[in-house]
Amino acid sequence: MKVLLTNDDGFHATGIKVLKEIIIESGIASEVWIAAPASNCSGYGRSIGVKTATDVYQIGDTEFIVNSTPSTSAFLGLREITGKKPDLVLSGINSGINVGNDIGYSGTIGAAAEGAMMNIPSIAISQEYDGKHGEINWINPQKFLKKIINMLLEVPFWNKSTIMNVNFPLVPAKGIKFTSQGEYIPSNKIEKKRNVSGSISYTVHRIAPDKGNRGYSDDSIKAIDDGYITITPLKLDMTDFDALESLIALYKDCTI
């Protein structure tokens, strides 16, 4: 099996190094390729560089640094860098979970979406991190990711245009739960600074609510808080079909 690894934390991030080690040691793939951004691109979502030249630096036989966004990195990795199309795309391991409404900002999800657009099984992988306990502990993905990947690849009804979004909790995992995305909404802190030039600089900080104060129901956020690994299927087609049917029914006689 040929696997493409990508991420949004950047080529030099620990998470993608851990992911590479897991895939090599597990024997899941015979070929492991990496195409990842030159620097941290968290929050870049699905932005892609078009009509601009993108520099790509080859580091090893199958490892490439892309001077662009996560989606551009995956796009070039899939269509140019790897040659023959990979059998699997793994995006991560992200430092911090990707759940709730924050998913729309996620470069980890955005990079995985490039694989899903080509009907390649694509998995986004994230590790919870609260910034309060020093180094990130990767023990959960190191213990369980191989099993999860093999399990998902055996799913007979997996529509390959669906991204599998996997999140690992901060604490030792109690098990796995299949969950919905949820409605997790962080608060924002905006720092404002006036520059000598006369311009104003704004720095946005996303602040996660304390556990127990997130306003969730039985979704991926609650499962993570309860110590479970979560797996959430995400569709590329964002159509609200209930609303679509209602609009068609409401305006069935609409004319212009």
UniProtKB/Swiss-Prot annotation:
Coiled coil: none annotated. Keywords: Cytoplasm, Hydrolase, Metal-binding, Nucleotide-binding. GO terms for cellular component: cytoplasm. A divalent metal cation binds at residues 8-9, 42, 94. Its EC number is 3.1.3.5. It holds the Pfam family SurE. InterPro entries: SurE (IPR030048), SurE-like_Pase/nucleotidase (IPR002828), SurE-like_sf (IPR036523). One of its GO terms (molecular function) is metal ion binding. Its cofactor is a divalent metal cation. The keyword Cytoplasm applies. Binds 1 divalent metal cation per subunit. It is an enzyme of class 3 (hydrolase). It comes from the Bacteria. Belongs to the SurE nucleotidase family. Nucleotidase that shows phosphatase activity on nucleoside 5'-monophosphates. This is 5'-nucleotidase SurE. It comes from Ehrlichia canis (strain Jake). The lineage of its organism: Bacteria, Pseudomonadati, Pseudomonadota, Alphaproteobacteria, Rickettsiales.
